[in-house]
């Protein structure tokens, strides 16, 4: 697709960008946050819920859909959009990250990667061409190349080998891609090495993909290292193409990523912490299970106008979580997704008015981020999924 991305404005005092991404299922205003619906659903929400909070782009995961229900079934149903009754934009991850998180359950060679299904133990083999074919059959608007995501503790030689294999696979994915209505994005690797990140960005930029993602970050490393790597890497990617930072979704991280020049974000964080009773607010995350909320008559977030905050007291939400009622998870998820959707709209408006830096400073002056040590501990636990299942 020609002219798939238009850069409308760049901040005069940072690298924050305001743009528009055009796809077969509509226009996306950037910078944008995409909720994750790995298995063709954003957990606990309907498409109508997402639209009600102005979400028009979500992510689904090819690995999970390949194993269950299977790509042929979704194709027979008319593609992923019809299968899940979603007429907005869908970005599909190739599943590379999930496959490589299987560690001892997978083996790779230059041709592709073999792995054992976490569902039934069967052995599967996927090539870069397969990853492209699967995503074309799904009919997503944005597809990702198959990449090798090295472990956060990988040696320099292992990171180099993973980067070089990622480059070769990206080239094969590009050659195999034939669906003109779908954008294929490359994924920059290189660990935390500035030199390897530069090499990866420059090589993939030379292949002229419609967009570029930064993979292999936000895997438990300190946040200052994450964003130092992001800022460095983006210097070597074309300004006229969208930049996608994978796996980032905390409010403070979205602000920092935007200031670096990132256009697209995705993360399971808002939905996952919602199901654990954490509600985003302008002051930081609020734990609804705290006894202080047991008798609070007003909404948990007085500044929020989402369905949850308009209709339910904090005391009621506290009760639902204490009783482990399913409605608790749904109402918390609606709130967290609405919070991030509103935050991204405010970010876009501030870039348009060239006051993003003031907006960011004002937000962070009141917002209390999660303790860094706790965040890293949670991240490491989440990276390995549950019951042997790779992360969503």
UniProtKB/Swiss-Prot annotation:
> Where is substrate bound in this sequence?
93-97, 147, 189, 216
Which GO BP terms sit in this record? queuosine biosynthetic process; tRNA wobble guanine modification; tRNA-guanine transglycosylation
- HAMAP family attached here? Q_tRNA_Tgt
Which residues does the annotated region (RNA binding) include?
Answer: 247-253, 271-275
Residues in the active site?
93, 266
Question: What family is this protein classified in?
Answer: Belongs to the queuine tRNA-ribosyltransferase family.
What's the name of the protein? Queuine tRNA-ribosyltransferase
Residues bound to Zn(2+) are 304, 306, 309, 335
Q: Which UniProt keywords apply?
A: Glycosyltransferase, Metal-binding, Queuosine biosynthesis, Transferase, tRNA processing, Zinc
Cofactor(s) annotated in UniProt: Zn(2+)
Q: What does this protein do?
A: Catalyzes the base-exchange of a guanine (G) residue with the queuine precursor 7-aminomethyl-7-deazaguanine (PreQ1) at position 34 (anticodon wobble position) in tRNAs with GU(N) anticodons (tRNA-Asp, -Asn, -His and -Tyr). Catalysis occurs through a double-displacement mechanism. The nucleophile active site attacks the C1' of nucleotide 34 to detach the guanine base from the RNA, forming a covalent enzyme-RNA intermediate. The proton acceptor active site deprotonates the incoming PreQ1, allowing a nucleophilic attack on the C1' of the ribose to form the product.
Organism annotation: Dehalococcoides mccartyi (strain ATCC BAA-2100 / JCM 16839 / KCTC 5957 / BAV1)
What does the entry list under GO cellular component?
A: cytosol
Record-listed E.C. numbers: 2.4.2.29
NCBIfam families noted in UniProt? Q_tRNA_tgt, tgt_general
Highest taxon of source: Bacteria
Q: What does the record give under GO molecular function? A: metal ion binding; tRNA-guanosine(34) queuine transglycosylase activity
Identify the gene encoding this protein. Answer: tgt
Please name the pathway: tRNA modification; tRNA-queuosine biosynthesis
Q: How does it assemble?
A: Homodimer. Within each dimer, one monomer is responsible for RNA recognition and catalysis, while the other monomer binds to the replacement base PreQ1.
User: Can you state which reaction this protein catalyses?
Assistant: 7-aminomethyl-7-carbaguanine + guanosine(34) in tRNA = 7-aminomethyl-7-carbaguanosine(34) in tRNA + guanine
- Give the co-factor note: Binds 1 zinc ion per subunit.
């Amino acid at each position: 697709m020609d002219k798939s991305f238009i850069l409308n404005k760049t901040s005069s005092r940072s690298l924050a960008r305001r743009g528009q991404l055009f796809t077969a299922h509509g226009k996306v205003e950037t910078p944008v946050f995409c909720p994750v619906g790995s298995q063709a659903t954003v957990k606990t929400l309907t498409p109508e819920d997402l639209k009600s909070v102005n979400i028009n782009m979500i992510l689904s995961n090819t690995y999970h859909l390949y194993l269950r229900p299977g790509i042929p079934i979704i194709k027979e149903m008319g593609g992923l959009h019809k299968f899940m009754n979603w007429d907005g934009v869908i970005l599909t991850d190739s599943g590379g990250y999930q496959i490589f998180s299987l560690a001892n359950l997978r083996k790779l060679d230059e041709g592709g990667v073999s792995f054992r299904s976490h569902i039934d133990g069967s052995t599967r083999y996927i090539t870069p061409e397969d990853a492209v074919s699967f995503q074309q059959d799904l009919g997503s608007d944005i597809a990702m190349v198959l990449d090798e995501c090295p472990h956060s503790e990988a040696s320099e030689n292992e990171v180099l080998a993973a980067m070089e294999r990622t480059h070769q696979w990206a080239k094969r994915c590009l050659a195999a891609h034939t669906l003109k209505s779908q954008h294929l994005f490359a994924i920059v690797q290189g660990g935390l090495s500035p030199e390897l990140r530069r090499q990866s960005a420059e090589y993939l930029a030379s292949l002229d993909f419609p967009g570029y993602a930064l993979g292999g970050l936000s895997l438990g490393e300190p946040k200052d290292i994450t964003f130092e790597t992001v800022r460095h890497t983006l210097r070597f990617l074309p300004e006229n193409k969208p930049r996608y930072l994978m796996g980032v979704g905390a409010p403070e991280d979205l602000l920092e990523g935007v200031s670096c020049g990132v256009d697209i974000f995705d993360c399971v964080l808002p939905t996952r912490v919602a199901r654990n009773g954490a509600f985003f607010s302008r002051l930081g995350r609020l734990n609804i299970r705290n006894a202080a909320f047991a008798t609070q008559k007003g909404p948990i977030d007085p500044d929020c106008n989402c369905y949850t905050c308009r209709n339910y007291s904090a005391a009621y939400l506290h009760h639902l979580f204490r009783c482990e009622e399913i409605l608790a998870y749904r109402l918390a998820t609606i709130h967290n997704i609405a919070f991030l959707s509103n935050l991204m709209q405010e970010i876009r408006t501030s870039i348009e008015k060239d006051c993003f830096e003031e907006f960011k400073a004002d937000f962070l002056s009141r917002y209390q981020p999660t303790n860094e040590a706790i965040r890293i501990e949670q991240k490491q636990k989440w990276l390995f999924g549950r019951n042997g299942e790779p992360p969503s």
